[in-house]
Amino acid sequence: MFTNNLTKNALVTLVSGFMAIFIGFNTVQPAEAYPIFAQQNFKNPREANGRIVCANCHLAQKPVELEVPQAVLPDTVFEATVKVPYDKSIKQVGANGKPAELNVGAVLILPEGFQLAPSDRIPEEMKTKVGNLYFSPYSTEQKNILVVGPVPGKDYSEMVFPILSPDPAKDKSVSYLNYPVYLGGNRGRGQVYPDGSKSNNNVFGSPVAGTVSEIKALKSKKGGYEVTITTASGNTVVEKIPGGPEVIVSEGEVVTVDQPLTNNPNVGGFGQGEAELVLQNPARIQGLLLFLLATIGAQVFLVLKKKQFEKVQLAEMNF
């Protein structure tokens, strides 16, 4: 989610700046720090109906993928792989109205008790896969919800989250069960700001019915247009269009209410996914192994006894 007035909030600027420095990516515009706005406006990123709140600002739907192990043991580090695919050749409309590379971000909602693995617990091989990504908890009370981004999509359309599983022997609130894991992933900027206003990565429509009487190109650095519409009663309404979208109507054209005046510049989108993993009890695995060994042993014993019985029968027949 994005906004143009991020600099008004010192805390948000500090957090966004730290994230950008940490990942070595210093070209992220403040308007692209979308995870911050979900954290600011929603206590929980997943609503009761299962919808992740990032969809409030990122209106287009795009696919995402989530891969987790089928089962994990307690107090172990494992990988959760997030994929946010998109065509790397395309560019989006930046906040300044100019073409820009797409960034990606994600929110991973883990079961309670699961959390980001400490650095000293992450194997070197996994650290290589993680790269320079910086993950942060959604809040101090929700360490099981992790956010990342915005980061360059050309480098991180696939992200590896290092996760530490809980130990029910130490945390009595956790049980050996089958758990859901939820993902929200995005590529590109949003179409709506948290206050409900449109970004320049959106379609702009006619506020009234009438005739387009003038289309004026603005001379500001960010570009844009002023489209004047004259209604049937003779009133004029001016629709200001920021730099980025292209005007698709012409002077003298009759338009209706909400008819698009511009193209849709958005090339990104948001998607949700989910997976399941089992927090496996080691004692169950040990019990299963013992059962299998006992079963195999019994089968071998029966085969040997059968062969021994056949030998005795054969000897009696020969006698």
Curated annotation (Swiss-Prot):
Q: Which cofactors, by name?
A: heme
Q: Which GO terms describe its cellular component?
A: chloroplast thylakoid membrane
Which top-level group of life is the source organism from?
Answer: Eukaryota
Q: Which UniProt keywords apply?
A: Chloroplast, Electron transport, Heme, Iron, Membrane, Metal-binding, Photosynthesis, Plastid, Signal, Thylakoid, Transmembrane, Transmembrane helix, Transport
What parts of the sequence cross the membrane?
285-305
Identify its membrane topology class.
Single-pass membrane protein
Q: Which Gene3D superfamilies match?
A: 2.40.50.100, Cytochrome f large domain, Single helix bin
Q: Where does heme bind?
A: 34, 54, 57-58
* tRNA-binding among keywords: no
Entry note: cofactor: Binds 1 heme group covalently.
Function summary: Component of the cytochrome b6-f complex, which mediates electron transfer between photosystem II (PSII) and photosystem I (PSI), cyclic electron flow around PSI, and state transitions.
Query: Which family does the UniProt entry place this protein in?
Result: Belongs to the cytochrome f family.
- Protein's UniProt name: Cytochrome f
**Native source species:** Oltmannsiellopsis viridis (Marine flagellate)
Q: What is the lineage of its organism?
A: Eukaryota, Viridiplantae, Chlorophyta, Ulvophyceae, Oltmannsiellopsidales
User: What gene does this protein come from?
Assistant: petA
